[in-house]
Amino acid sequence: MADQEYPVYGEITGPIVMIGFGSIGRGTLPLIERHFKFDKSRMVIIDPHPEGDNAKIAEDHGVRFISEAVTKDNYKDLLTPLLTEGEGQGFCVNLSVDTSSLDLMRLCREIDVPYVDTVVEPWLGFYFDTEADNSTRTNYALRETVREEIRKHPGGTTAVSCCGANPGMVSWFVKQALVNLAKDLGMEFEEPAANDREGWAKLMKKAGVKGIHIAERDTQRAKDPKPMETFWNTWSVEGFISEGLQPAELGWGTHETWKPKNAKKHKKGCKSAIYLEQP
């Protein structure tokens, strides 16, 4: 139940199913508790790793914990009864690795359940497929599968994909930065609606913007300082390894007239990115 000391942004009338309970899941749980009205007895967390503090943290929050992996073979049988149990409309929060975002979205659409995730994730094995070429193993290719689904099946129950920090919140920040830039340049303009893609593109062109570079500053600090000449990964271990096996990718604007020697263009989709023949 939401704490009245915090603003409550909405009510979830049905069950809530959170898939994955790593660092992002553990950080998201308190936010759901603070900012949504819901029946905590109808919330469940699914994660294959009960060891450590996972199960205990869920128990301390009064949330049911299921120790099981969501796989290509079991996801429909596992998730459907959990998301449709009882009255109201359920809500699926996918914060896991190795679970196909696209398949989960399709399932949620079938059973009329809103869905949100932080990245377009494939099923286990995608990043280690030695038979796949570099183009099909890119994040661009993964995102295009969702874009194609939208084109084929518009409308339906809301699904919000890639809504983490980056990608996600950075898109909102870029819009505000563009508005600030236009004001600083003394331009006469009307701020486009949030979903007016063409309007934002025209404003970007009018302001003379050709490239957007987003730099992230990691402010995490460990109790024991990192020794010199060492590398510590403060991100997802699974994510770091899997993305390290993918080709390097770059967003590539329509104004670009050249590309690196080892760069390749995509043959399908919006073609807004290129990839390098190297990690």
Q: What is the predicted function of each stretch?
A:
Residues 59-73:
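Rossmann-fold cofactor-recognition segment
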Residues 12-30:
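Glycine-rich adenosine-cofactor-binding loop
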Residues 99-114, 118-157:
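Rossmann-fold NAD(P)-binding glycine/threonine-rich loop
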Residues 137-232:
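Rossmann-like NAD(P)H-binding beta-loop-alpha module
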Residues 209-279:
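Glycine-rich, aromatic-lined ligand/substrate-binding cores of catalytic
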Residues 37-57:
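NAD(P)-binding Rossmann-fold cofactor-contacting core
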Residues 70-84:
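Conserved Rossmann-fold cofactor-binding substructure of NAD(P)-dependent oxidoreductases
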Residues 1-14:
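A short, basic/flexible loop-to-alpha-helix module at the beginning of a structural domain
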